[in-house]
Amino acid sequence: MEQMSVTQFAGELKMPAAALLEQLKRAGVDKSSAADLLTEQDKSRLLEYLRRAHGGGEPKGKITLTRKQTTEIRATDSTGRARTVQVEVRKKRTFVKRDELLGDAASAESPLLEEELSVAGEAAGEAVAAPEPVLEAAPVEVVAEPEPVQPEPLPEPEPEPVVVEEAPVQQAAEPEPVEAAAVAAEAESPESAQPAAPRARPVSITELLSEEEIAAREREARRHRELVERQQADLRARQQREAAAKAAAEARRLDEEAKARAEQQKKEEAAKPAAKPAPGPTGTLHRPAKADDKAGKDAKRGPAREADGAKRRGIKTRGEVGGAASGNAWRGAKGGGRHGRQQDDRQTFQAPTEPIVREVHVPETITVADLAHKMSVKATEVIKTLMKMGSMVTINQVLDQETAMIVVEELGHKALAAKLDDPDAFLEETDAHKDAELLPRAPVVTVMGHVDHGKTSLLDYIRRAKVAAGEAGGITQHIGAYHVETPRGVITFLDTPGHEAFTAMRARGAKATDIVILVCAADDGVMPQTREAIHHAKAAGVPVVVAITKIDKPEANAERVKQELVSESVIPEEYGGDTMFVPVSAKTGTGVDELLEAVLLQAEVLELTAAVDAPAKGLIVEARLDKGRGPVASLLVQSGTLRKGDVLLVGATFGRIRAMLDENGKPVDEAGPSIPVEILGLSDVPAAGDEAIVLGDEKKAREIALFRQGKFRDVKLAKQQAAKLESMFEQMAEGEVKSLPLIIKADVQGSQEALAQSLAKLSNDEVRVNVIHGAVGAISESDVNLAQASGAVIIGFNTRADAGARKLAESFGVDIRYYNIIYDAVDEVKSALSGMLAPEKREEVIGMVEIRQVFTISKVGSVAGCYVLEGLVKRGSSVRLIRNHTVVWTGELESLKRFKDDVKEVKFGYECGLQLKNYNDIQVGDQLEVFEIKEVARTL
C-alpha cells in the first residue's frame, strides 16, 4: 500500500492533524510536521499504543442485577370480606462474560479495537460492519446458559396461599425485560464504555490488517451470528411454551369458576323453597325426638344417602336435603346453621358481566324472527323496540335493511349492511370473456331526435324499406333494431321514438350504442326531445354525429340549426368543435352516403372490438308477448356468439332459445357481436333494458332467476310496508285523494312502461292515476276480473281483448278502451281526471243597490227601501253591505218586494224593498253589492 502523509491520514480519520501528531509522538513515532509520510510500521505502532491506552487487556466484566416488583391482588378472608394484599417479587441475576464467547485473545481484542477506531470515519465503516455482531452477541450469549443465569427469586413470606402462586407467574411472565436490562447494562460496563474517549482519532483497519486476518474475523462473526440466532430461537420456543402453559392454566381456572357459579346457582334455586317455614314433623306429638334422631343419622351417613332417604320416606327437611337432591351433593348436613349461610352468601357474589356487543350482518330484507336470532335476543324485544319507534309489526313481518339496522343499533349491537348469498357471484367467477380473443365488430348506431324530424324515414332510405308508413299515426312507438350491410361495412341501427313519453326507451338506446346520430329538422330546429337526446348521449359518453334532415324543403335553414346546437354545447367542426354535421334528405337521398361515411369514420377512431368465440352477452332492446309464440324478446348481442339452443338468463327470467329470427323475420342459427335478433323460449316477458347472458347450466340459470324473483318481491314488500307506515299520518291529515285506477295492456314492454309513466305524470294533490296492473299481451279474462274487483278502466295499447274477455266485460260492465297512438290515450285520461277535479267557485257581481230609507217593523225587524243603481237584484242572492267603502257584513237576502208584492228580481232603475237575513244594523246611505257564486269546471 502506498504511503500517505499525516495530513491525508488525519483527513481520512476525520480528526485534526495536530491531534494525530500528538498521538504519534506518544506512541513513539517521531513525526514533526503534517507533511511527513507515514509507513505501515508507524500505523502498527500507533494501533498498539491505542490498545494499551484504552484497556484492551482488562479482565472480563461481570454484572449483577437486582429487580424488585410490587403488585396488588384482592382476596377474601375467612369472614368473606375482600381485602387488598401487597405482593413483592424480588429477583437477582448475575451475568458473566465467558471465554468461549470471545474466542482467543487476538480475535477478541481486534473487534473491540475495530469498533473504537471506526465509529467516526465513513471509510472504515464498511470494514467493521461484519465483525460488529460480536459485541451484540456477548451479553445475549450468557442468557442461553441456564446454570449461571438462573434467577434467585426472593419473595416475601405471605400468609395467603395466593401469593405463593403469584410469584412464579410474575417470574415467568417477564424474562425479556430482565434480559434486555442485562444487555443494556453490559453495553454500559467499563469494558465497552472506555473506548468512547479516543473516537476523535480513528484509524482505518483495512490499512492495519492483512486479508487473512479480515477473513478470519468474518468467519468468527458469522459463527457468532449463527449462535445468536439459535439462542434467540430457543428463547422464543421457551416463551411460547410458557405462554401456552399459562393460557391452559387460565382456561382451567375459568372453567372451574364457571362450574362453581353453576353449582352456586343450583344451590340458590334449591334453597328458595326452604325459605318458607317448614311444617312440623310427620310423627305423633308424643314422639317428636325420634324423627329428629333419624334425620341426624341420615345426615351422618352423608348427603347422598340423606337425599335417598328423604326421597324414599318423604321426610320434610329444612332445605339441605332438597339442595342435595337437586344436584348440590357436595354440601353436607354440617353446612347448616349461621356459619354455613355466611359461606353461601360469600359464594353467591358474582362480578358484573359486560353486555355482549355483536356484529349483526343485516341483508336487504329480513324477518323480525331472523333479526332476533342474529342478535341472540327474543323476538318480543325486537317487537317492543319497533313499537317504541312507532311501528306495529308481527314476528314474521319483513323489515327493510334500513329499519333493521336502526333496530340493531337501538339494542346496543353493531349493524353491518350485508348482501345475501347471491348466486349472481357465480356469473363473475365463470366469466370466459376475459381470456377470449378480441376481434373488430360493427358499430351500433342509435338514431335519436325530436318527434317528426325524420328519423325513421332516414333509416328507411338506408334500408330501402317502408317502415314509417306502417307506424300508427306516422310516429315511431317502438324501438327497432336493424343491421345494414353497406359497401363500407356493416352498421347496426337502433331507431328510438322521439315522442316525450318514450324517455326510458331513448335512455336504453343510448346505453347500448357506440355512436348517436342526432337528427334535427332544418325547418324546425332544436326541440325539447332534441335536447334530451343530447343529454342522454353525454350521460352515456357516446360520440354524436348530427344529421340535419329535410334540407330539400324551401323553408330549411341549416345555419340556424347549427347556431341552436352550439348553445347546447354541440359544436360543428367548421366552428372549431369535434362534432360532424351532415345535411341529408330522406326523400332524395342527398347526403346519406356522407352520413354513413362519417359514422364509419367515427367507428374506426373508437376501435370497437368484442370477443367472438365466447358465451354471448347482450341487452334486451324490446320485449313482447306473442299470442302464438309466447314471450318474444329483441336482443342486441354485445359480445360473444349467441346460438340456437343456448341457455339464456335475462334478469328474473331464463329459458333455452328455441328459435332466433333476424329483423326481417328470417330464422338464423347464430348471431355475433352487434347483431340484433328476436329470440323465443324465455319463461316470461323480460324487462326492456335487462342484461342477458348465456350460461352453460340450465339448473344454475333457474336458481339465479328464482333468487332474483324472490329478492325483488322481498324488497318490494319491504318498501311498500315502509311507505305505508310513513304515509299513514299524511293520508289521515289530507283525507282521501280521488284516484283513477287503470289496467294497462300493451303490445311491447317498452310501450307499456312509457304509457304508465306518462299517465302517472298527470297526478296531482287532488287526483291520482293508480296503475293497478301493467303487462304485455292481449286483454284476458283475469284482467277483466281484476278491473271489476277494483273498479278500474282497462286501456289496451296496440292490443285487443279476446272473445272470452269481451263477453265477461259486457256482463260486468267493465270499460275497455283501445288506443294506437299514445297522444290519444294521454288526452283521454287527462280529460277523465279533469272531470274528477272539484269545480272552482267564482264570484260574479250582478248589481249594486243603495239604501235610501230604513223602516223598523215590530216582529219583523229592519226593512230597507232601496234603489237599484246597477244591474239587477235577485231573491236569495248573496250580498255585501258596504258602509264608507268598507265591507261590514256578507250574507243573503231574506225577502225582496216591489210595492206589496214579492218579486223574483228587480232591474236597474227601479225601487224595491228588501230585508237581510239575520241582520238589522242598516243605515241610510249604505250600499249593497249583489253577487252570485258560479262553479267553473277545472282542467289539468
From Swiss-Prot:
Belongs to the TRAFAC class translation factor GTPase superfamily. Classic translation factor GTPase family. IF-2 subfamily. InterPro entries: DNA-bd_dom_put_sf (IPR009061), EF-G-like_DII (IPR053905), EFTu-like_2 (IPR004161), IF2_assoc_dom_bac (IPR013575), IF2_II (IPR044145), IF2_N (IPR006847), P-loop_NTPase (IPR027417), Small_GTP-bd (IPR005225). Residues 138-147, 161-208 have a biased composition (Low complexity). Signal peptide: none annotated. The gene is infB. This is Translation initiation factor IF-2. Residues 214-271, 289-311 have a biased composition (Basic and acidic residues). Pfam families: EF-G_D2 (PF22042), GTP_EFTU (PF00009), GTP_EFTU_D2 (PF03144), IF-2 (PF11987), IF2_assoc (PF08364), IF2_N (PF04760). Residues 495-498 are annotated as: G3. Residues 585-587 are annotated as: G5. NCBIfam families: IF-2 (TIGR00487), small_GTP (TIGR00231). Its main location: cytoplasm. The lineage of its organism: Bacteria, Pseudomonadati, Pseudomonadota, Betaproteobacteria, Rhodocyclales. Residues 440-609 form the tr-type G domain. Residues 549-552 are annotated as: G4. Keywords: Cytoplasm, GTP-binding, Initiation factor, Nucleotide-binding, Protein biosynthesis.
